[in-house]
Amino acid sequence: MKTEYEKMLAGEEYFAADEELIVLLNECKDACWEYNQIRPTKLKERNEKIQQILGKSDDDTFINQPFYCDYGKHIRVGKRFFANFNLVVLDEAYVTIGDDCFIGPNVSIYTACHSTDPTERNTRNEWARPVTIGNNVWIGGSTTILPGITIGDNVTIGAGSVVVKDVPSGVVVVGNPAKVIKKVKG
């Protein structure tokens, strides 16, 4: 029989208040709290801590504080990753971000899904869908990316956008919901 954690990573319905999940969530909350308390000028210490939190990152990963995530180990970022203040990643499923990606302030990336039916939602059951972001992507401030989204390479997402469907490579998207407004070179 699968554990709730195994169900979560498999994209199956799982009980979000499971004891094992709560322990993992709290461990990550503590790690994020510790990261957020490191002085901004202590770059080496910050980088060491963020590498402990994330599932994959490089020496050139830079995430401005504060930073929040649920598990951390499900987040994989490529080379030369930069995120500005207040990045929130609900990583119940894997979040994979390519090389040369830049994220503005107050961006939220969600993988957790809940029922829209209040009775079902109150059971604390949910499911998760991975988010994949390609190479050379700029995500403007206050953007929200919903569960299950794939964003192609060479994409710009305008500030304040809500990404509710996949984004092809080589475009600029803006709005709520985010829509393609033009193609980009590259």
Question: Where do the protein language model's features map onto the residues?
Answer:
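Short secondary-structure boundary/capping segments
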Residues: 5-6, 53, 123, 130, ...
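Terminal amphipathic alpha-helical/low-complexity segments used for targeting or macromolecular assembly
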Residues: 1-60, 178-182, 186
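Short arginine-rich
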Residues: 36, 165-170
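Beta-rich strand-turn-strand
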Residues: 140-166
